Amino acid sequence: FEEDIEAGATDSRQVEIRDLGLNRKGKEFSYLYDFGDSWQHEILVEDRLSVENKGQLPLCVACERACPPEDSGGVHGYEIHLAVREDPDHPMAEDWAGWLDPDFDPESFDAHRVNRVFDREFGGFRRSPELA
């Protein structure tokens, strides 16, 4: 994948989040997830929230919509995925029938679930009960 990395890009395996300067309001950066599907994320630090107990970090406080399923074909593939979900008579419905998860809800997002993953992945930091 080395040849796919754009000029001026930094390999995420070589940088730590704290090195990105995310403590500054207005900080922007791009993140390319999944070279095959080319999910390009533009991230903007809109605000900083104070946290009384630093042990509650990292913490997800809000988000919009569910992440697209893995290997969904990038933006174009995900658009087809959504169209097929909405219209069972869609021309691509038969091709996608075995791939679609009937329980997937593109409108859902569970910050509590994300925080449980953070707890598991980042050492089980203590959280306030209302955010756990």
Enumerate the language-model features and the residues they cover.
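Short linear regulatory motifs enriched in tryptophan with gly/pro/ser
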Residues: 1-132
